[in-house]
Every structure is written in C-alpha cells, then in structure tokens.
C-alpha cells in the first residue's frame, strides 16, 4: 500500500513539475530557462553568500524520485522564485519572471496537489530583504552602509542573512554587465529577455545596473574589483576574431561532421613526411588560436591572411582529393560569410561596459618595467609592512590616461583559516581564486613565487628580483581548505604557459617546516567539535586582517607532511623537534642541503599508492638521513666488497663520481654550452681510455667504485630497495657522458673502434648510417666496440663464465651443450687490412663472460674454425659424440703447459655480443 502511495505521489509531482515548462510571459516567451540551472559560482560568488538555500529546476528534477511528502516538494519549489526575488533588483526582468512563477505555484501547482493532499500549503519564507538593494546604490559604493537593528527588522533580515550581507558589503562584489544585458536595457522592452540556459542573476546595485556602471567616470574609478577570473581586455578586432573562431566550430558538412576537424592539427611528420616538403609554411587552427591567446595579431587583416594560408596549404596538398577540396571550399565560404557579419558591426557593440580599455604589453613604474606574468608586491591597506603577493594577468589603460592591472592574489599563512597543527614552509604563500583590479600605483616592487615541486629539483636559473616565495597549495576561501597544486602551468597566464622554466638542479635539498604564526589565537576552550571560524576582515581592498585557527582530528595519512601531529612525514620535510641533520642550511629559504636521499629525485607517486608511506616514512626515533637498504645499513655508508679480479678504474673514477654521485651545479649554461662540455668530457675520457691500455695500472681508490655509484643512483631513482648490484669487469667501464636525445653523432656502441672512424667512412654511406642509427648505450672497453643486442645479469658463477676457446681448441674437440641455430656470418669489410684489425683488437688479460651464446658459423667460414660437425648433429648421434670425446680425453696429455690459454672476449661484463662478431673474433684468433 505504501509503495502504491509513493508511486502515485511521484507521478503527481512529476506532472506538476512538467507544467512549469509550458509557462509563458505576456509576450508568449517561456520563462523556464531563467530558473533551469544555478548561476556559476565563480562568476557570481556573492549569490551563494546571500542565498542560503540555492535551488534550480534541475535540482528539483533530481529530487523528484526521493520525495516522500508533497509538502517538501512545494517548499523546494517555492524557494526558486524567492531566491530570484531576493538576489535581483525589483525592476529587473528576472524579478518579474519570479513573481510570475510564484503566482503559478500558488494558483496551479498547490491547488492541484491539494486535491489529493488537502494539508499542503504554500510556505512562508519571509519578506524579501529590500535593504540590500538600497545599500548597494552606486552613490554609496564608496561607503559602508550601517544597518541598524530597526532597519533589519523592517527588511525581514534574520541574523544569518545580516551576517551574509555584512560579508558581501565588506567584499564589494561587483558583476560586470554582459552584452545581452546591455542590449536589453537599450531596448527597454520585455520582448527581449535573457534566454540563456542558465540562471543569470542581475546585479543588485540598481534597477538599471548597466547604465549606472557605464556612467562611472574617472572621478569615481572602479578600484579593486573582486573577480573569480581575469577580465577580458580585448580590442574590438580581437573580439571579432574570437567570435569567428567560435562560430567556425559549429559549422558542419553534408555528413553532419564538424567542418574544421581536418584543419585543427598539422599532419604527423612520421606519418606524412611529404607534407612538410610540399608545404613550406604550415599552419593550422591550433596555431591560429595560440596566436590569438598570446596577442600575436596586431590587426584583423593578419588573422585573415593566416586563415587563407591554412586553406591554401590544404588545397595544395590535397589537390587530387576531390572530397577534401570540397571541404576546404565550404569552409572558405563560411569563413567569408562570418567575416562580413563581424566587420559590419560597429565597434560600440564590443564595448559592454561603456568604456574603451586598451590592452598593454607592459607598464613602467619607478623606472622598472612590468609585464604580464610578473610577480609583484601590491599595496596592502591592512598592513603596509606586508604587501600583497600577486601575479599580473592583465594590463590596460583607459581613455582618461589611467593604467590598470589585474592580479591574482596569494595569501600568507597568517591570512588563512587553518588547523592549529598545520605546518608551513619558510616564505610560503597560497594561491587564491581572487583576481583583483589595481591601479598600477599600487605596485611596490617585484618578487618571485616558485612552485614547490620545481623548488625541490633546484633553483630558478633566472635572476630573482625581490623576495622569493614558495607555493604548493591552492587556498579555498569558502571551504577553508588547502589543495595541492598538481599542474602549475594552469595557474599561470596563458601567455606564459608555453614557456619553459629553466632550473639549476640541486640534490639533497630538504625543507624545514614551521608552526602556524597565529597558533596562539586558538581559544583556550577550543574543542574538536567547534565550527570552522571565519577570518577577521579588514579593508575590503585587501586580504583578511588576520586568519583563524581551530582544532582538527589527527590524520592517519599525511603524504605531504602538512601537520605536526601526524605520525608519517616525507623525508624531504624536517618538522619541528625532528632530529637535526648535517648539511648546509639556508636560513633565508628555510632549506638544508644534505648528502642523504630525498624524494626530490624520485618519481612522483600517486597519493593513493599503498607503498608511498612505507618508503617515505620518517619517525623521530629514526633520523631521516638513514635511508635504509635491504641490508639495514645506510646506503651511502655500505662497504661493498668487490671481487679481487675487478678492474679498479683509476683515471675514470673521479670523473665518474663527480658526474654520477655529486654533480657540480653551474649557475646557468645554455644547451649549446652544455653539449660542448659533454663532448669535451667525452673526448677526454676516450683519450684516457687509450692511454690506459699502455700505461701501467695503479691501484684505484677504494672509496668510490662504479658499483657503489650505480647502487646510489638506483636508490635515488627507485622507490624499491634493491640488493647489491655489481657492474665492474676487467677492461670494461661506462663512459661518463650524459645521455642526450636525438644526438645524431657516433655516441653509441658501434662495431668499429672510434680511433678508426675516419677509415670507416671509406665503407660508404650504408656503414655510416648503420653506425649513426644505433641507439645502444655508451659502453667502452679495451678492444673494439660491439653491437649490444642483449643484456644479461651476472650470476657470479664461474661455471657460466665461458671463454671464447670453450668452442675452439686444436688438441681437443668438445660437444656444444646448447641448441644449434643457423646464422649467416658477415665477412669483415675488405677495406680493413690485417694490420688495422690487429691494431683494433688488443685483447686484455683474462676476462670471464657471463653469456649464452647461440651461434653456428656458416659453411663458407667453416675452414677457419674447428670441426663443428657436432654442432649440426642431432640427438640421435649425441651418444656417439660423447663416446668419441671420452676416448680422446683418455689419450690426451693433461699437463697445464700443453693446454691452450683461455681466449678472453672483448665484450663488456654482463653483455652478450652478437654471433656475427664472435665468429669474426674467433676467425682472427685462428689466423694467429
């Protein structure tokens, strides 16, 4: 029975809800679009301060299936017109529509529902507060109205609404009228209402807000306007360009597909390389939009030229494709039509605020030039000793000669509301959603704000003028919460988002965190159940006079080290009362440079990861400097015992250590200088390698080896703990040259020695291209280079370290214990003489190699090898081969002096050489 009643109720309410979409005004225009959705919070922040219970038709639609009482439905429905009349001025179109909707609910909807539920009544939501509209008249914008208790009672204001209005008065929130509002006021007729798909509240400043705002002259400037985003400061021709690009996205072809789809991006160079040989000046719609955003177009004509160039390129390249030609012609036709429409409009249609604002690229104050993207210190009326930190987003001038800027504000810790146990970096600021207009006279000087993620990696390479701040979080003033900024470029002006931020790397940097500067403001009787307090507001043209603190529960996870009461903390943060660490302290930035590992060199781990905290965990009982490996010994202090026959690199050890473990930090070098430096180091390393083959070996330093350095790097770059890694081998080492992408030089492992590179050029373009296109790692050792095709891990077992003559011996035949694989053997180049090959091959002392060799020489080279018939034999004759070998072994002299010495390979330890190279190497040994 209850289910039947609920089904009937929902059906009844759905019928009454649908009826409102047929409601029209006296001119036959439907009014529902005005109340369909709520206004955007960023554009109308004051709406959500005044309206305590915002509801739209869409909100009502979502609640329909959940209503169990018809009275709740009527209460929510009645809230919609009441909110509209509360926020909007009496003479506005929206206010009139709200009265019409209210009458419809009372006369139709409530009447129909009462037929089935007689107890339903229209709710009394109170009187519409009129004092707000009166207090916000333009003549009173410069003064704060004083609302007496008597006036509040007359206006029907409850204490909560009085607080909301007081907060709104202090912020002086101001909304700019739109083009549509301007045309409505000019027409002054109800036949031209707003028909957007969302509620567009009109400002409460006056019944005719557009006219009043437009008439404000330079004698009463609109200073310190609070916005949720930067204002649009464009000349009429720029607005024409934007309108055309916006309308072009709506154009479709005969198949109802977007017409501009083929013009959005340029063809991929790898897929269509011929495009860039045919088209000498490529351009696409994406490039055009970037030019518009970065203000590259100085007039409308240059935009037309670029668009026509794009069409010409398209027609030229696809001249044989009739469908693409038709598409380009259709797009050109629509473009010309839109151009005619936009150019026919007067410039006044693009001036919604009634005044002309000229965008500026830069301004000059006190012999200092400022431009968009600069970080500045602005005048703070609340405290002149703490200027406002901001970034310039817009610069413009007005017809009266005044110059203005729009800046995004960054709050200091003492200007925010936060938990009393929250920690802050030295000179930390938080990004807000406030974009304020200032006269340029408010600029007090320059500063710089660096993103924390970048500051972890190093210092900015550009010169910093003024104080430097660090920013990691975005501060939400409404919810009093801090959110980590993941994408810093999204916080910057569009003109700067494509620019790189060069950074000088700094390793081992850790950050001190400090208690809240306003922690003493916590009330003595504060509890965890207290409401989040509000900041103390001062002047409306400045950040809060002082923030507030409150108690919060202890967090189980604190991935970012935000609170002093948390058990977990990243190791790059040093909290108060943490054990001291050794290093160089920078008191100005609140950082310390240590030799221990930090997460600054580690990949960013998602906050939801379950393995982040165990690897980053730091407690007071265990200093953060003791980053432990699997052996429970600090990694940088482990004593790695090396095998006695490992080569100690005397000449390369110091340079390798400097590059891999503790890189020097230059002030700044251009990419070309860095490349030259890398090349010079490379040639120096090569010369040392050549000298090492003739010079007597000296015992290398035991403090640093390649194994210790590679283990250190592994610990830096991995979030897991690895066992000890050994890479040393006789005659093998890694060249200390930084790996650079797209370097088309011989900086990778090749088949020929670099000392004979000039001779290799005689082989022709094919051999050179084969060398240049190699992408293997830079590995060198005494002897010729080899093409690395497989990397294996050394097991440390002598049984698998097989010398080359394991398969070659004149006095001994041995069966190969692996599967036979046919492979063609390439003859060495004819241009290489035997003397040259002898110079190239300079085998070092005994060298063991851990590898699985799958090779079988071809028949035409079998004369240079031992009898390898056993390699080709199958399983059927395996027993005969074993028997023959056993009989030969019995008659063979086993004295050491009759044994042939092991032939060492020239491959690097832990690397497999190609079968082609090994066959060539064995053949040359046989000639000896």
From Swiss-Prot:
Compositionally biased region (Acidic residues): 883-902
Biased segments, Polar residues type: 600-620, 667-679
InterPro entries with a match to the protein in the record: BAH_dom (IPR001025), BAH_sf (IPR043151), Bromodomain (IPR001487), Bromodomain-like_sf (IPR036427), Bromodomain_CS (IPR018359), Rsc/polybromo (IPR037382), RSC1/2_bromodom (IPR048047), Rsc1/Rsc2_Bromo (IPR035700)
Compartment(s) where it occurs, according to its Swiss-Prot or TrEMBL record: Nucleus
Residue span, Bromo domain: 4-112, 240-342
Listed Low complexity bias regions: 621-631, 692-701
Main location: nucleus
Pfam assignment, any one: BAH
Superkingdom per UniProt: Eukaryota
Modified residues (Phosphoserine): 670
Keywords (A to Z) from UniProt: Bromodomain, Chromatin regulator, Nucleus, Phosphoprotein, Repeat, Sporulation, Transcription, Transcription regulation
Residue ranges, annotated region (Disordered): 558-586, 598-635, 657-701, 871-908
Gene Ontology cellular-component terms listed: chromatin; RSC-type complex
Residues covered by the BAH domain: 368-486
GO molecular-function term, one example from the UniProt record: chromatin binding
GO biological processes: chromatin remodeling; double-strand break repair; double-strand break repair via nonhomologous end joining; nucleosome disassembly; regulation of sporulation resulting in formation of a cellular spore; sporulation resulting in formation of a cellular spore; transcription elongation by RNA polymerase II
Note: Present with 259 molecules/cell in log phase SD medium.
Function according to Swiss-Prot or TrEMBL: Component of the chromatin structure remodeling complex (RSC), which is involved in transcription regulation and nucleosome positioning. RSC is responsible for the transfer of a histone octamer from a nucleosome core particle to naked DNA. The reaction requires ATP and involves an activated RSC-nucleosome intermediate. Remodeling reaction also involves DNA translocation, DNA twist and conformational change.
Family: Belongs to the RSC1 family.
Assembly information from the UniProt record: Component of the two forms of the RSC complex composed of at least either RSC1 or RSC2, and ARP7, ARP9, LDB7, NPL6, RSC3, RSC30, RSC4, RSC58, RSC6, RSC8, RSC9, SFH1, STH1, HTL1 and probably RTT102. The complexes interact with histone and histone variant components of centromeric chromatin.
Protein name (database record): Chromatin structure-remodeling complex subunit RSC1
Organism lineage string: Eukaryota, Fungi, Dikarya, Ascomycota, Saccharomycotina
């Amino acid at each position: 029975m209850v289910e039947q009643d609920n089904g009937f109720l929902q059906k009844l309410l759905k019928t009454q809800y649908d009826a409102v979409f047929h409601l029209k005004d006296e001119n036959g225009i439907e009014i529902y679009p005005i109340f369909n959705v709520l206004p955007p919070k960023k554009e109308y922040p004051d709406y959500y301060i005044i309206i305590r219970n915002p509801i739209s038709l869409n909100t009502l639609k979502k609640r329909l299936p959940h209503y169990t009482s018809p009275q709740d439905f009527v209460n929510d429905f009645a809230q919609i017109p009441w909110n509209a009349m509360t926020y909007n001025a009496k003479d506005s179109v929206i206010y009139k529509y709200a009265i019409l909707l209210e009458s419809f609910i009372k006369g139709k909807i409530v009447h129909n529902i009462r037929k089935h539920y007689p107890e339903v009544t229209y709710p009394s939501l109170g009187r519409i507060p009129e004092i707000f509209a009166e207090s916000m008249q333009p003549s009173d914008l410069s003064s704060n109205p004083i609302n007496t208790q008597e006036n509040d009672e007359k206006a029907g204001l409850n204490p909560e609404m009085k607080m909301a209005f007081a907060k709104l008065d202090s912020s002086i929130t101001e909304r700019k009228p739109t083009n549509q509002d301007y045309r409505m006021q000019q027409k002054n007729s109800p036949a031209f209402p707003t028909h957007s798909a969302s509620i567009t509240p009109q400002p409460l400043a006056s019944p005719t807000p557009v006219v009043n705002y437009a008439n404000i002259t330079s004698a009463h400037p609109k200073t310190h306007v609070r916005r949720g985003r930067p204002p649009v400061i464009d000349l009429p021709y720029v607005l024409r360009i934007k309108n055309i690009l916006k309308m072009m996205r709506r154009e479709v072809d005969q198949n109802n597909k977007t017409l501009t789809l083929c013009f959005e991006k340029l063809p991929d160079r790898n897929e269509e390389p011929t495009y860039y040989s045919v088209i000498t000046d490529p351009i696409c719609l994406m490039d055009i939009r970037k030019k518009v955003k970065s203000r590259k177009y100085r007039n409308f004509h240059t935009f037309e030229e670029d668009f026509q160039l794009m069409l010409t390129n398209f027609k030229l390249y696809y001249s044989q494709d009739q469908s693409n030609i038709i598409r380009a012609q259709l797009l050109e036709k629509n473009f010309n039509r839109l151009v005619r429409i936009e150019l026919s409009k007067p410039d006044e249609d693009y001036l919604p605020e009634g005044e002309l604002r000229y965008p500026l690229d830069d301004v000059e104050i006190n012999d200092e030039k400022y431009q968009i993207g600069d970080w500045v210190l602005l005048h703070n009326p609340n405290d002149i000793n703490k200027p406002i930190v901001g970034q310039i987003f817009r610069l413009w001038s007005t017809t009266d000669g005044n110059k203005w800027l729009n800046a995004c504000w960054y709050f200091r810790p003492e200007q925010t509301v936060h938990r009393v146990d929250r920690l802050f970096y030295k000179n930390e600021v938080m990004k807000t959603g406030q974009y304020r207009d200032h006269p340029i006279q408010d600029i007090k000087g320059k500063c710089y704000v660096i993103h924390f993620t970048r500051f972890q990696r190093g210092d900015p390479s550009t010169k910093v003028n003024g104080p430097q701040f660090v920013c990691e979080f975005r501060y939400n003033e409404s919810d009093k919460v801090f959110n980590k900024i993941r994408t810093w470029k999204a916080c910057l002006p569009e003109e700067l988002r494509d620019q790189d931020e060069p950074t000088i790397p700094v390793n081992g940097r850790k950050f001190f965190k400090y208690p809240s500067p306003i922690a003493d403001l916590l009330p003595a009787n504060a509890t965890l159940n207290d409401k989040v307090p509000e900041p103390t507001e001062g002047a409306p043209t400045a950040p809060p006079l002082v923030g507030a603190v409150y108690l919060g529960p202890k967090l189980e996870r604190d991935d970012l080290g935000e609170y002093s009461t948390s058990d977990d903390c990243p190791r790059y943060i040093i909290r108060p009362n943490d054990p001291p660490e050794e290093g160089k302290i920078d008191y100005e930035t609140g950082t310390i440079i240590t030799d221990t590992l930090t997460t600054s060199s580690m990949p960013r781990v998602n906050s939801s990861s379950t393995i982040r905290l165990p690897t980053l965990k730091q407690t007071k009982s265990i200093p953060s400097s003791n980053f432990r490996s699997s052996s429970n010994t600090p990694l940088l202090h482990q004593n790695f015992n090396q095998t006695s026959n490992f080569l100690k690199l005397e000449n390369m050890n110091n340079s390798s250590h400097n590059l891999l473990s503790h890189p020097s930090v230059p002030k700044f070098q251009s990419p070309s200088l860095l490349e030259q430096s890398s090349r010079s180091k490379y040639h120096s390393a090569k010369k040392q390698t050549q000298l090492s083959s003739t010079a007597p070996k000296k015992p290398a330093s035991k403090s640093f080896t390649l194994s210790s350095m590679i283990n250190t790097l592994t610990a830096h770059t991995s979030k897991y703990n690895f066992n000890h890694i050994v890479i040393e081998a006789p005659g093998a080492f890694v060249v200390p040259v930084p790996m650079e992408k797209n370097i088309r030089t011989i900086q990778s492992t090749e088949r020929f020695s670099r000392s004979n590179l000039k001779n290799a050029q005689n082989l022709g373009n094919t051999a050179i291209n084969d060398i240049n296109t190699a992408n293997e790692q830079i590995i060198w050792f005494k002897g010729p280079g080899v093409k690395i095709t497989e990397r294996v891990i050394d097991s440390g077992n002598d049984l698998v370290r097989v010398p080359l003559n394991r398969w070659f011996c004149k006095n001994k035949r041995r069966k190969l214990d692996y599967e036979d694989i046919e492979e063609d053997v390439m003859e060495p180049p004819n241009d290489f003489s035997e003397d040259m090959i002898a110079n190239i091959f300079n085998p070092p002392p005994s060298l063991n190699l851990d590898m699985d060799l799958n090779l079988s020489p071809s028949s035409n080279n079998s004369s240079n090898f031992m009898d390898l018939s056993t390699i080709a034999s199958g399983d059927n004759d395996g027993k005969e081969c074993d028997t023959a070998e056993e009989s030969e072994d019995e008659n063979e002299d086993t004295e050491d002096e009759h044994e042939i010495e092991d032939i060492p390979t020239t491959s690097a330890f832990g690397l497999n050489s190609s079968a082609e190279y090994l066959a060539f190497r064995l053949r040359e040994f046989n000639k000896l």
